[in-house]
Amino acid sequence: MKNYTILFPGQGSQSIGMMDSFSTNTIVKSTFDEAAEHLKKDFWSMVALENSAIHQTENTQPIMLISGIALWRLLGSLGINKPISLAGHSLGEFTALVAAGVISFTEALDLVTQRAKLMQSAVPDQVGAMAAILGLEDEAVVRVCQAVQSDEVMEPVNFNSPGQVVIAGHRNLIEQSLDSFKEAGAK
C-alpha cells in the first residue's frame, strides 16, 4: 500500500447503526467492552440500536473515540503498513493521539468524557442547540444567521467542508430558522 494519512472524525459524524458492519468482529467488540468497563456505560447499544442517546454530547464524544480506536485496532490486525501521519478533526484529535501512542485509550476516554461534560455544562439544558446546514455556501449561511437574529443569538461556528456549516445558538432561534435555511436552498 502506498503512503497514506488517517483523519479521525469529530462529533457530528455519528449515526445509529454506524458500526453494524463490525458487529461480529472481536476486535471492535472488545474495544467497546473495554470502554464500557472503564466508563461503566454500554456504548455498543447506543450505536447498534435505535437509541437517541447516541446524539447526546456526553455519549457522542466517547462513542466517536471508541469507534475510531476500534477501527484503528482492526486496521492494525490486518497487517497493513502504518500511515505516515495521523490527524483528527476537533474531537478526532484525541483518537489520533491514542493511535499515535501519545496517550492511552483509557486516558483519552477520561479526557473526552470530561470534555463532553464541560461542553454540556457550558449551556443550560435545553437553551442551546447546534445544527449542521448542508448544501449552502458559507456566505449564505452567514446571511441567514444575520437575517434571523433577534434578542437571541445564532452564529455559524464550524465550517466543516464546502456545503457543510454548523450553526449554534439559542435552541428556539435555531429551530425557527430551519425553514429559512431550506428556503435558501439547504437540504
Each language-model region and where it sits:
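Alpha/beta catalytic cores of group-transfer enzymes, especially the acyltransferase/condensing modules
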Residues: 11-13, 100-187
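Gly/Ala-rich beta-loop-alpha elbow adjacent to hydrolase catalytic centers
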Residues: 68, 84-92, 96, 104
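Residue-level recognition of oxygen-bearing side chains
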Residues: 27, 91, 172
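Alpha-helix C-terminal capping segments
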Residues: 74, 78, 97-103
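An amphipathic alpha-helix/helix-turn recognition signal
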Residues: 30, 63, 90-91, 103, ...
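Helix-rich "cap/lid" substructures immediately adjacent to catalytic or cofactor-binding pockets
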Residues: 2-87, 167
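Short, glycine/charge-rich beta-strand/loop segments that flank catalytic centers
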Residues: 51-52, 87-91, 116, 128-132
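Hydrophobic side chains within alpha-helical segments
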Residues: 64, 70-71, 96-98, 110, ...
